[in-house]
Amino acid sequence: MAAKIRRDDEVIVLTGKDKGKRGKVKNVLSSGKVIVEGINLVKKHQKPVPALNQPGGIVEKEAAIQVSNVAIFNAATGKADRVGFRFEDGKKVRFFKSNSETIK
């Protein structure tokens, strides 16, 4: 099955502490989660790694968020949108459901 949310898509968070925030998808995980730039930041306690010259400390990084809690952002309408699929010239492409505009 083709993915409705892909890497480098701009998405908007629908639920949770970051509701309403927008960001770019960095990674789509096979477990049904996505990692979005600047969204769902958590603090990790990291041990120093002298071999790699990495200092220890508290590091802030993005955690995964369920794909059902984000929606693709339609720049034309300025709102969250749903994704559909159709065939154009023998290729399967994604489109916004609200205005039938092809994505990328």
Curated annotation (Swiss-Prot):
SMART domains, sorted: KOW
InterPro entries documented for this protein: KOW, Rib_uL2_dom2, Ribosomal_uL24, Ribosomal_uL24_CS, Ribosomal_uL24_KOW, Translation_prot_SH3-like_sf
GO molecular function: large ribosomal subunit rRNA binding; structural constituent of ribosome
GO biological process: cytoplasmic translation; ribosomal large subunit assembly; translation
Entry GO terms, CC: cytoplasm; cytosol; cytosolic large ribosomal subunit
Function according to Swiss-Prot or TrEMBL: One of two assembly initiator proteins, it binds directly to the 5'-end of the 23S rRNA, where it nucleates assembly of the 50S subunit. It is not thought to be involved in the functions of the mature 50S subunit in vitro.
Assembly mode: Part of the 50S ribosomal subunit. Might contact the SecYEG translocation complex when it is docked with the ribosome.
Name of the protein in its database record: Large ribosomal subunit protein uL24
Organism: Escherichia coli (strain K12)
Gene expressing this chain: rplX
